[in-house]
Amino acid sequence: MGKIIFYDDRNFQGRSYDCMSDCSDISSYLSRVGSIRVESGCFMVYERNSYMGNQFFLRRGEYHDMQRMMSMGMIFDTIRSCRMIPPYRGSYRMRIYERDNFGGQMHEVMDDCDNIMERYRMSDWQSCHVMDGHWLFYEQPHYRGRMWYFRPGEYRSFRDMGYSNMRFMSMRRITDIC
């Protein structure tokens, strides 16, 4: 199991909230998050309640202040929810599709891909089926830009999920010992 502690001030000061599972509304415990300590496991933190908005991946470590987190690539300054990423040690496998509802060109993916356009000759893809493992998708090649967490399941339409103007350009397996 994982454990993440949110503090309302920088440098682990002020009130705190200990979390060992998913939390859809951190603001019911703290009015703001100034620093974070991940004692064990891996977590996705979200800009809005109910796991919505921009996301950022956190592994075990200390995050002293939001300014430092923003310099690491986090593009938002509020954290309202978090999701624990369960430990996983199996194989990784997913299928990506050119169109909604698993239509069009399909590719099976089992490892990291730093540039989907170059490797698969796909400028865009609109649905996927994650069969095994936990993955991070990025909006730019080489694991840059905004990121999204995908766990096993069927994702029939990125547009219906609120990603209508989003193009995923790289993907990485979450292989950390979470």
From Swiss-Prot:
Q: Which residues are in the Beta/gamma crystallin 'Greek key' domain?
A: 2-40, 41-86, 92-132, 133-175
Assembly and binders: Monomer.
An example GO BP is: lens development in camera-type eye
Q: Which family does it belong to?
A: Belongs to the beta/gamma-crystallin family.
Supply the name of the protein: Gamma-crystallin M1
Function comment: Crystallins are the dominant structural components of the vertebrate eye lens.
The annotated region (Connecting peptide) lies at 87-91
Question: What organism is the protein native to?
Answer: Cyprinus carpio (Common carp)
SMART domains attached to this UniProt entry: XTALbg (SM00247)
Q: Name one Pfam family in it.
A: Crystall
PROSITE patterns in the record = CRYSTALLIN_BETA_GAMMA (PS50915)
Give UniProt keywords alphabetically: Eye lens protein, Repeat
Q: What free text does the record give on domains?
A: Has a two-domain beta-structure, folded into four very similar Greek key motifs.
Source domain of life is Eukaryota
Alphabetical list of InterPro entries matching this protein: Beta/Gamma-Crystallin, Beta/gamma_crystallin, G_crystallin-like
MF (Gene Ontology): structural constituent of eye lens
Q: SUPFAM superfamilies attached here? A: gamma-Crystallin-like
